[in-house]
C-alpha cells in the first residue's frame, strides 16, 4: 500500500533544495548495489547516521522537509511513521535509463525493525512511481510513503529533463 501526502511542501522550498543538490559535488554511482555500472544511476547521500563532511546544510534542509511531510500527514490523519531520518538521499534519473525494479532494506535493517520509505520529486518531469505493480502519479510537493520490501521503481520518464527525487528511510509506527 502507498500513502499519498499531498501538498506537503511548498514549490519554492523544493526548487531551492533542487538547486542545492544540483550544485553538490558528492554524487556517486553506488546504486543499485551489486549492479553493473551501466545499470547504476547518480545518487547523493544526504544523511546516513554518520557525520558527512559538507552535508550539514543539506541534512538540515532534508530534516525540515521531512518535518513538513510529517506535519501534513498528521493533519491528514495519517500517523504512520516517526519523523526521524535513518537515511536520506537524492537520485537523478532520466529518459535514457530505464529504472530497475527493486526492493530496499532486505539485508541492512534488523528483521524486527519496521521501516518505511518516503519519496518526493523536487520538480515535475513526466515520470511517476511504480510500487507492487501499481503506478502512482508523482507531482512536486506530494510525497509517497511505502513499504520498501515491496518491489518498486520509477516509471519511464518522458521529458528531456532529469528527474531529481528525494527519498527517506524512516521508522514505521507500529501501534
Model regions and ranges:
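Non-heme Fe(II)/2-oxoglutarate
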Residues: 1-81
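Substrate-binding/catalytic groove segments of enzymes
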Residues: 27, 126-130, 152
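Conserved short histidine dyad/triad with adjacent acidic residue
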Residues: 90-110
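Short coil/turn motifs at secondary-structure junctions
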Residues: 95, 125, 171-175
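Short beta-strand His + acidic residue motifs that chelate non-heme Fe in jelly-roll/DSBH
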Residues: 99-104, 151-159
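A short beta-strand-loop-beta hairpin characteristic of the jelly-roll/cupin
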Residues: 113, 121-139
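A short hydrophobic beta-strand segment most commonly corresponding to one strand
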Residues: 116-120, 160-175
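Conserved metal-binding segment of the jelly-roll/cupin
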Residues: 137-152
Amino acid at each position: 500500500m502507498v500513502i499519498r501526502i499531498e501538498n506537503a511542501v511548498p514549490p519554492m522550498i523544493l526548487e531551492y533544495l533542487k538547486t542545492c543538490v544540483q550544485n553538490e559535488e558528492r554524487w556517486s554511482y553506488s546504486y543499485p548495489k551489486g549492479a553493473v555500472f551501466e545499470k547504476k544511476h547518480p545518487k547523493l547521500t544526504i544523511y546516513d547516521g554518520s557525520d558527512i563532511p559538507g552535508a550539514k546544510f543539506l541534512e538540515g534542509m532534508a530534516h525540515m522537509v521531512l518535518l513538513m511531510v510529517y506535519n501534513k500527514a498528521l493533519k491528514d490523519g495519517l500517523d504512520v511513521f516517526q519523523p526521524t531520518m535513518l537515511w536520506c538521499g537524492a537520485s537523478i534519473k532520466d529518459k535514457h535509463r530505464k529504472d530497475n525494479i527493486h526492493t530496499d532494506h532486505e539485508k541492512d535493517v534488523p528483521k524486527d525493525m519496521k521501516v518505511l520509505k518516503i519519496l518526493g520529486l523536487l520538480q515535475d518531469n513526466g515520470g511517476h512511481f511504480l510500487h507492487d505493480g501499481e503506478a502512482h502519479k508523482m507531482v512536486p510537493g506530494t510525497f509517497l510513503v511505502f513499504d520498501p520490501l515491496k518491489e518498486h521503481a520509477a516509471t519511464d520518464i518522458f521529458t528531456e529533463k532529469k528527474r531529481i527525487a528525494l527519498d527517506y528511510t524512516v521508522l514505521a509506527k507500529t501501534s
